Structure formats: C-alpha cells, structure tokens
Curated annotation (Swiss-Prot):
Gene Ontology cellular-component terms listed: DNA-directed RNA polymerase complex
Keyword Lipid biosynthesis: no
Catalytic activity: RNA(n) + a ribonucleoside 5'-triphosphate = RNA(n+1) + diphosphate
Lineage: Bacteria, Thermotogati, Deinococcota, Deinococci, Deinococcales
Subunit structure: The RNAP catalytic core consists of 2 alpha, 1 beta, 1 beta' and 1 omega subunit. When a sigma factor is associated with the core the holoenzyme is formed, which can initiate transcription.
Any single Pfam family the record assigns to this protein: RNA_pol_Rpb2_6
Protein name: DNA-directed RNA polymerase subunit beta
Length: 1152
C-alpha cells in the first residue's frame, strides 16, 4: 500500500489525444491459442487452421502401400475437448499440467464391404492456456514465445560475380514442409537447385510439357537477340525429360517412370509434403501479380504435371536480370494486362518476415506426433485382422502425447515464465525470437538480421532487446502492434481524407504501408482535424520529407506506438540515448516487488494497463457492489441488470486472493484488497493489488529524494550511497520465498522414513518439528536447521546363514539408521510459511517411481536493502550500493530534509540519459505539491513547463520561510554568489531573493553537508526520482567455504556457489605470489588448500588440536598427470634427492 490510502491527485501532460486505447497486451498469445483450439465453434464450422488442419492433413489414413491392401481407410470426423480435471491453481499446488482430454470421432471404412465402424478415440491430454496467456506444465508456469522467421514465398536477391550483378530467385515453403528451391544464372544457363542438386530449369519445363519452340520463346521474351546456350535436353518429350530429371535428383535409383512421377509429385506437388502455406501463396501472388490458390509449386492432374507459379518466377527473374522496371503478368478479370513492378527483395523487411505464434507452433508439433501415430496405424492395418479392426484398436496416442511433452518441456520456444514482477510477466508473453527450431542460431546471425529496420516502426520495438549474444535476435512487440491471420505484424494508422485526419483506424502490414505517405502522431492539428501547418513532416518508405496536407494518406495513432510496453514506461524517453534506454527497459523487468509498493510520482500513463493485463492483480469482470472483503476473498453482489457470466453463484461473484505464493523467480506473489464494503465496481476495475501494484498502478520501485553530486568517493564508478532511513522505513524491503523438498524412497536396504525420531540429535535441534518430523509453519529457521526429519537405513554387510537363522528366531534387531534430513542450506533461512506433504495414493498426486512420499517446505525471507545490492532508475542509470549512511550524515536541504540517495554526476553526461534529470526536476515539483504526474512518451512535459512549476513551488516555499522569520543566512548567500560566478544563474549583486527564484528555475538547490553542517560549495540538483531494487541481490551471490566437496578425479575443490565450491587460485594469482617470493604461502595454496589429500587431512587435525600445521605431500593432480603420461606410453618416475625412485602411488593401487 502507499503511505496514504488515498489516491494522490494525478496531473496529466501531453497535447495529443489518442484515438484508440492500447489493445489487450496478451492478445498475441490468447487469440492465437483460441484460433488453434476453435473450441467455441461447432465442428462443421471450424476453419482449416490449427488443430483442425493437423487432423485434416493426417487423415484419411489409407494403408495401400507397395501393392498390398486390406481395403481399410481410417477417416476423421470431428474432435472435442473434455473438461480439465484440475484448475490451474490445483495444478501449481500438485505439480500437475493444466490440460484437457482430447477426443476425436474417427470412422473406419472397409472399402470392399462398405462397412463403417465409428468410434470416439482418446488422443491424449492437450495442455491448455490460462486466461493470462501462459501454460502450467508440471506445476510451473511456462510461456511459449512467438518466433519470427522468413516468410514462405518467392524472393529475388542479387550478388556480384566479378563485376557483373547476378540475380537469384528463391522459392521458400513453410518450415519443414518441403525443399528450398533456388534459380540462378550460371554461364547463361538458368539453373535450378533442389536439395543441393543442380540442373537446367529447361529440363523441368520440358516435364511440364514445354517444347523447343516454347522454351525459345520463353527465354528470348525480354531479349529477342539473345544467344541461347546449347540445350542438352533438346527434342526430349515430357517422359524422357522426367526420367533424366529423376537420374539427376536420385542418381542411385534405377529410372522408372512410375517411380519418377511418384518422386517429383512428393517433392513439389503433394499438398501433404510440399506446402507454401497461405502466407507463402499470398506473398507469391502479391509479388508476381497472380491470383492462384494452390499451395504447391507444381500441380498434377491426369498423369501430367502442371505449373503453379514456377514459369512466372522464371519470367520475373529474367526481367530483373535484363534491368526492366515492369513486367506483364497475365490479365485481370476485364482482360487488362497486369503490369507488375520488378524489384529486388529486402529479406529483413517485415513484409518478408512473419511471426509464428503459439497456435501455429503447437499445430506443427501436433502434426509431427500425428504423423508418427499414422505410421503406427498403417502398420497395424497391415499386420492385424482387418475384420476385427476398430478405430480404438488401431490408434495409439503415445506419439501425440510424447510430441506435446517434448514441445512444452524441451523446445527452445517454451520457456520458464519470468514472474519477477507483473511487467516481466507481460513482457515475456510479448517476446519475439528469431532463434529456435527452424530459426537462426546466435553464431550464424549476422549484423543485418539483428539491426533495426525502418519497417520495425510501430511493429517491433527498436529499443528493447537483450544486451550480449542475443542482441537483435530477441525483440519485443510494439505497444499497439497486432499479428494478423497470416502471421505478419500490423501497425495502426488513422486515415487522412483530403488533408483531414479522421478517427478511422486501419491496421497495415509493412509492405502495404510502403505505398503511403504517413504523418507523425505529433503533427499539429486544428480542432476540425485538418493539419495546422502548410507543410507536414511525413514519411514514405521510412524517408522523412515535407508534404502538402492533401498528399498525406495516413497518420500515426499515438507517439508511443513505436516502442514496446517496457520502453513506454520510461518518462522523458526522448531525452535518453538509445543504449541507456535499452538498459532501462530491460532493468524494469528485473525490479523486485517491494513490501511497500509506491507508484511513480512521474509516470507515463501506461502503468494502469500493465497491471490490468498482466494477470497478477484481481480485476473485476462484473458490475455490482462489494458486500464482503477480507484478506483471502472479495465478494461482489451483482446489480440487478448485470449479465450472469462465468463464476457467478446466485448473484454473488467471489474473487479468491492469492496470499504469499512463490513465483518462478522466488519473489512473493501476494494480493490485497483495495476496495471496501459498499464500493461500486465495474468490469475492468482493479479490486485487489497484486505484487508491485499500488491502487491499480504499476509500482516497481520507490519515489525517493536524490542528489546528483560527488560524495567523498563513495559513489565512484557507479557506486551508490544511500541513507539508512530507507532501510529503517522498509522502503526497499522485499519478501523472497524459497522452496525446498525432500523425497522418502524405497531403497534396496529398506524404506526411508519421514520422522521426528532422528538418532544423535538433541531436543533443541528438534524443537520446531511436529510429531511427523515436519517443521511447523511460523518457525524461524537458520542455515543448518532441520526442515524435515528423515532417516535411511545404513548399508550393512550381508548376514551369514547362521546370523539369518538367529534373526528369524529371535526377531529383527533394531537396524542402524542414519540421519538424511532436509536442512536449510548455507546462506538461506527465514520464516516457514507453508508445508505440503504428498503421499503415494493421494488423489491427483503423481510421484516419481520408487518415491513413497514427498514433503515441500516454503521458507520466506525478508530482505532489506544492503551494501552490494543493485539499484537502478528507469533511464539505465544503475549501480551497486556502496555505503549506507545514517540520515544525519547525508546531505540535507535548507528545511532539514535529508537526501535518501546520492548519484555520481559523472554518470550522466557521457551516457546521455538526460531523461533522469528532467524526471528529477518534475519529481521535485511532485514532492513539494504532493501530487503525481503523467508525462507520456514523446509527448512529455516541456522544460519550460517544469521550470515554471519549480518557480511557483519555490515562491510558495520562500514566502512560508519569510512568514516564519527565517531570513537568508550568510552561507546561503555565498553559495548563490558562487552559482553566479559559475554561470548557473545571473550574479545576484545583492538581490538574493531574485537569485533564489532563479536558482529554483534551474532545479538546483543549496545543499548542506550532514557531517559538518557547512553548505556544499555549489548548487546541487536535488529532486525525487523513481529508483528500483533489482533482482541481483548480494545475498544470493555472496558465498564462503572452509571445507566442502572435492572433484573426484583431481581432488580439487569444486567451483561455484551452487556446488558449495572454493575460490579458484588461478595462473595469474600464482604469478603474483611468485613475484613476491611468498614460497610457503604458494606451496600451501597448491597443496593443502587444494588437492593434497593426506596433507589437508593432517592440516585439519592440527588446526583442530591447536598444533602447528605440518608440511605437505604430493598433490593429487600431479598423480593424475603422471598417470596420463603413463597412458601415452611414457615411463615417468619421481626421484628423490639421492636419485632413488619414489613410489607416489604407494598404498593406492594393487601391486602388479
């Protein structure tokens, strides 16, 4: 909650009114999955996409193969989804997958007898998407991110052979749905490349029925005088050409006509194996000016192959090579010849790249699973008894289930959801990746693919992308962008009619946008919608120019349509350098939700939408009045005329709240109500704040008073100095929840037991365990404390027959057990908030084989801000807390207000992120007036407006000071004089009141050193800035070890915090000790502190007993080296001072 429960007054800047609101920010995911399932449509009305298309492609399954046939055909009628057995919440609790059973109605037709058997077959469980656009797989939230790839279709590109420019055509099908085909000129011959095999394209044209005369006419159409090279296939008929083509493509196989037809059909004409897809055919028709519907490159009818776009591609390529500007491609419905412009293609243009969303990726994966299932069906048809066959007996659903599991569990595009805060959650669903199956790889991707393209405008954010190896390959959807049915990204524009801007909004793909002149969103307009200026700055194909208003076709809908949601949350973005804005965008997603959420004093107006669309807060979906509120539920009674929808029982809708739940990243998901009994609520209203939400506005950090000044070197190199007041007031305190689990298994020695009865432990160690040995909720635990008591049987030698006899007579003696309890790991601890016990046989519990029961313990930790934590603002200014000073030692303002945080001024000019300075000045106005501001991206408050507000606030403050009798003292006058000398203000010349007002306009203040009480020599920028604590906390990174695990072979300590490893003393560190001649220290480092087994044991004993540490022996790694040299056949011996061999392996190995 905020410091006050009342909403502060929010004042909005910005001249531009937005004609359409932001679309639903998760619609890319939700709509795609809906289109994939089509669950709300009747079976006979379903479109041929998604799940339906996967079924339609695989069925009917006919086993007529290699001349054998039993006359069975398995055909598909319809599919339906059952009800999911568990809710998403139950699935998270029990480690289950949120899914629904998929049933298909199949019919088996006996062709001979005409008998039809119909059956409903269970095809496995299909994971379902939750309302917020994610999946719950094995209890964990996952997101399937969209993939961007080269759209199928035809592309014309150029390259230089020597000094001659040569053009190439490439025909690309849908991913994994056929071979890429390339056409290029080689010594005057147009060659075709399929599956790495080249042949003259004339050979394939002869197969399509072209004779010598037609070929000559085709190849000399644009250059009648051209000398055609010798054609080795001259005079061949289609069948001969087909056999010749078959020998080129399949050199090993004997050329037979039927085999050749079957091969070529499968390669380029079979819709099941070669598919341009709807986008591919659309792109091909657009490029070549045709209107074909076939999704293959060749057609096959009556035993003959026909053309479906190949000849047009050849003609276009020849026209391009000849340098023509247009080419005639057929005629339209009225018989008028269609002139198509001849241009090269830019493969990075967003008209040539498309997005594969969840639905398409899932359908592809299902197709793979169904293809495997169909193979199994064919085998069973051939091997089994045809009369006894039924659809249920023929179909095995295992391949489908395996394909789904593999996709969600192992695919590069199915990712563990980033739940650090609501923004990171939302951003993850809007991610677009060029990596993944069928995509690019980091190593292969060049600069061009990663670069910002002009068509990214309004579609893909030019700013938000990771730093490092994935830069430009992973990007984010712009705020208003949508993905259309064909997978192309569209941006919205307002239509301009005769120089007047209308409210009619049109969504356009990048290639359509290229045809128009588009004005910017900030072009000044008159009240009637006409442009206010005679010349309008607008762009065509990305080039800005001045146009007359009547020449403008469209106008941007909003200034923020160019950037993503993360970036649109940065106020004064237009004053920040892009590199720092990128860091600011990315770091907002790493902000940890704080205990006291406080929305920014200077926001951009997008904060509310992030909270409502991310799904982390509770949003009302009904109209009514709140009748009951507590920490776990809110009840809303519907108004009489409100529609009864969804989860309404009677006329009451109950909203369950999530309390202290662990997110994927270990942050705390907690919701608390912000409505009271009697409040009226409407659909879309936030009624309970989730993590990092304050009164329905996103609250990732805190509004704190900052100064930008050097501070005794404590803020050197981006280090940050903070006041202890922030820690005391819990401003940056966050709750983190760790999950620990332990399994009790059935072992060869006997079952493990979860119990309180653990040998060798005092009662004090067991005080927080209940009678079952599980820690009580509310207990405070420290590293080493027991969370769950468990005993396992010790391994013992096999008893002799006599012993076994005695045991059977006198009963089993108490067998030895060892303590294998779950303990708190080093560096962890906190308060136990929840324990869950799963036993085999419980409803809905699915334990691994051999596991009898599992106990899970959640421990919450309250983390205050400490030295070593990373903090950052929204403009990419980041640093590590270097010192926490008492508030009385921090610099303070003239009214005694101490500064909360000190940034280094050297971090601003070279990085050119001046947005933070403007935010600080406007934040200072917010602090003085107690209100909050909204300043939209690219439509922000002007510097002049901020100066005026600072002046008004300062005038009030000075008047108050005067009224209270506090005059300017001598020290303040000195600072003002100095400010005059520095040129910050005009020299005061005795008029200090005017100088104070002037200084206020600059946003600077007179600041005093808290330690000495003396004023700081020059004026300092002081104001309120929004600062976030990031997920990189020192507590997770700090690590120390005395003794611990060692590597098996080298016997050296392991590395890394996760392995409880040691610190590596590397080559350069050894050089440092050598340089100092510290021989004994060096020997210690290389022996007893590392891998001298006997030496380190002896040293440990000596330290425990308080004796002097004895010398070292031979390190283990030296023995490994000697053995490796032995394995090379080198006889290596170790000699002592008297040249006598020393057996370094004594006692280690059996004598030969």
């Amino acid at each position: 909650m905020s410091l006050t429960d009342q909403k502060p007054r929010i004042e909005r800047f910005g001249e531009i009114t937005e004609v359409i609101p932001l679309p639903n920010l998760t619609e890319v995911q939700v709509n795609s999955f809906k289109a994939f399932l089509q669950a709300d449509k009747a079976p006979d009305e379903r479109d041929d996409t998604g799940l339906q298309s996967a079924f339609r492609e695989v069925f009917p399954i006919d086993e007529t193969e290699k001349g054998r046939s039993t006359g069975l055909v398995l055909d598909f009628l319809e599919y339906r989804l059952g009800e999911p057995p568990y809710t998403p919440e139950e699935c998270r609790e029990k480690d289950l997958t949120y899914q629904a059973p998929l049933y298909a109605k199949l019919q088996l037709i006996h062709k001979d007898s005409g008998l039809i058997k119909e059956d409903q077959v269970f095809l496995g469980d299909l994971p379902l998407m939750t309302d917020d656009g994610s999946f719950v797989i094995n209890g964990a939230d996952r997101v399937v991110i969209s993939q961007i790839h080269r759209s199928p279709g035809v592309y014309f590109t150029s390259s230089y052979k020597g000094i001659k420019k040569m053009y190439t055509a490439a025909i690309i099908p849908m991913p994994k749905r056929g071979p890429w085909i390339e056409l290029e000129f080689n010594g005057g011959v147009l060659e075709m490349k399929v599956n790495k095999r080249k042949f003259p394209v004339s050979l394939l044209l002869r197969v399509l029925g072209y004779d010598d005369a037609q070929l000559k006419a085709l190849f000399t159409e644009f250059d009648p005088a051209a000398e055609l090279p010798e054609d080795k296939s001259a005079g061949m008929n289609p069948d001969e050409a087909l056999l010749r083509l078959f020998t080129v493509l399949r050199p090993g196989d004997p050329p037979k006509r039927d085999k050749a037809i079957q091969y070529l059909y499968g390669l380029l004409a079979d819709p099941k194996r070669y598919d341009l897809g709807e986008p591919g055919r659309f792109k091909m028709n657009t490029k070549l000016g045709t209107r074909r519907q076939d999704r293959t490159l060749l057609t096959f009818e009556d035993g003959r192959f026909g053309d479906a776009g190949l000849v047009d591609t050849i003609r276009y390529l020849m026209a391009l090579q000849q340098g023509l500007e247009t080419v005639t491609m057929g005629a339209d419905e009225d018989g008028v010849a269609i002139e198509v412009p001849v241009t090269e293609d830019d493969i990075d243009h967003l008209g040539n790249r498309r997005v594969r969303t969840v639905g398409e990726l899932l359908a592809d994966q299902l197709r793979v699973g169904m293809g495997r299932m169909a193979r199994g069906v064919r085998e069973r048809m051939l091997l089994g008894n045809p009369d006894a066959a039924t659809p249920t007996k023929l179909v095995n659903n295992r391949p489908i289930v395996a394909a789904m599991r593999e996709f969600f569990g192992r695919s590069q595009l199915s990712q563990f959801k980033d739940q650090t805060n609501p923004l990171s959650d939302l951003r993850h669903k809007r991610r677009i990746s060029a990596l993944g199956p069928g995509g690019l790889t980091r190593e292969r991707a060049g600069f061009d693919v990663r670069d910002v393209h002009r068509t990214h405008y309004g579609r893909i954010c030019p700013i938000e992308t990771p730093e490092g190896a994935n830069i430009g390959l992973i990007s984010s959807l712009s705020s208003y962008a949508k993905v259309n049915d064909l997978g192309f990204i569209e941006a919205p524009y307002r239509r301009v009619v005769d120089g007047r801007v209308t409210d009619d909004v049109v969504y356009m793909t990048a290639d359509i946008e290229d045809r128009y002149v588009i004005a910017q969103a900030n072009s000044p307009l008159n009240p009637d919608g006409t442009f206010a200026e005679e010349r309008v700055l607008a762009r065509k194909k990305g080039d800005p120019m001045l146009y007359a208003p009547t020449e403008v076709d469209f106008m941007d809908v909003s200034p923020k349509q160019i950037v993503s949601i993360n970036t649109s949350l940065i106020p004064f973005l237009e004053h920040d350098d892009a590199n720092r804005a990128l860091m600011g965008s990315n770091m907002q997603s790493q902000a940890v939700p704080l205990v006291r959420a406080d929305s920014p004093a200077v926001g951009t107006g997008v904060e509310e939408r992030v909270v409502t669309d991310s799904g982390t807060s509770v949003i009302s979906d009904v109209t009514g009045r709140v009748t009951y509120v507590d920490a776990r539920a809110i009840q809303v009674t519907l108004t009489e005329d409100a529609p009864q929808i969804g989860l309404v029982k009677g006329n009451v809708r109950t909203f369950e709240l999530v309390r202290f739940t662990r997110s994927n990243q270990g942050t705390n998901l907690d919701q608390h109500p912000i409505v009271s009994v009697g409040d009226e609520v409407v659909p879309g209203q936030v009624i309970a704040d989730g993590p990092a939400s304050d009164q329905g506005r996103l609250a990732l950090g805190q509004n704190i008073t900052i100064a930008i000044m050097p501070f005794d070197g404590f803020n050197f190199e981006d280090a940050i100095c903070i006041s202890e007041g922030l820690v005391r007031k819990d401003f940056y305190t966050s709750v983190h929840i760790e999950k620990d689990e332990i399994e009790a298994r059935d072992t060869k020695l006997g079952p493990e037991k979860i119990t309180r009865d653990i040998p060798g432990l005092s009662e004090a160690a067991l005080r927080d365990l209940d009678e079952d040995g599980i820690v009580r909720v509310g207990a405070e635990v420290k590293p080493g404390d027991i969370l769950v008591g468990k005993t396992s049987f010790k391994g013992e030698s096999e008893p002799t027959p006599e012993e076994r006899l005695l045991r059977s007579i006198f009963g089993e003696k108490a067998r030895e057990v060892k303590d294998t309890s779950l303990r708190v790991q080093s560096g962890q601890g906190g308060i136990v908030v929840k324990t869950v016990r799963f036993r085999r046989g419980d409803e809905g519990v699915d334990l691994k084989p051999g596991v009898r029961e599992m106990v899970r313990v959640y421990v919450a930790q309250k983390r205050q801000l400490q030295v070593g934590d990373k903090v950052a603002n929204r403009h990419g200014n980041k640093g590590v807390v270097s010192k926490i000073l008492p508030p009385e030692d921090m610099p303070y303002l003239e009214d005694g207000t101490p500064v909360d945080l000190v940034f280094n001024p050297l971090g601003v000019p070279s990085r050119m992120n001046l947005g933070q300075i403007l935010e600080t000045h406007l934040g200072e106005v917010a602090r003085l007036t107690g209100q909050k501001f909204v300043t939209p991206v690219f439509d922000s408050a002007t510097e002049e407006a901020i100066k005026e507000m600072l002046e008004v606030a300062a005038a009030e403050r000075l008047q108050r000071r005067k009224d209270e009798g506090f005059e300017l003292d001598k020290r303040e006058q000195e600072v003002l004089d100095r400010a005059g000398k520095l040129g910050v203000i005009s020299p005061p010349n005795g008029d200090y009141a005017a100088a104070q007002m002037q200084l206020a306009r600059t946003g600077k203040s007179v600041l005093y050193d808290g330690r000495t009480g003396e004023p700081i020599s020059g004026p300092v920028v002081v104001g309120t800035m929004y600062v976030m604590k990031l997920y990189h906390m020192v507590e997770d990174k700090l690590h120390a070890r005395s003794t611990g695990p060692y590597s098996l072979i080298t016997q050296q300590p392991l590395g890394g915090k996760a392995q409880f490893g040691g610190q590596r003393f590397g080559e350069m560190e050894v050089w440092a000790l050598e340089a100092y001649g510290a021989a004994h220290t060096l020997q210690e480092m290389l022996t007893i502190k590392s891998d001298d087994i006997d030496g380190r044991d002896a040293a440990y004993q000596s330290i425990v007993k308080g004796e002097e540490v004895s010398g070292s022996t031979i390190p283990e790694s030296f023995k490994v080296l000697v053995k490796e040299l032995h394995s090379l056949g080198l006889d290596v011996e170790v000699l002592d001072n008297n040249d006598k061999p020393v057996d370094i392996f004594e006692g280690m190995m059996p004598k030969r």
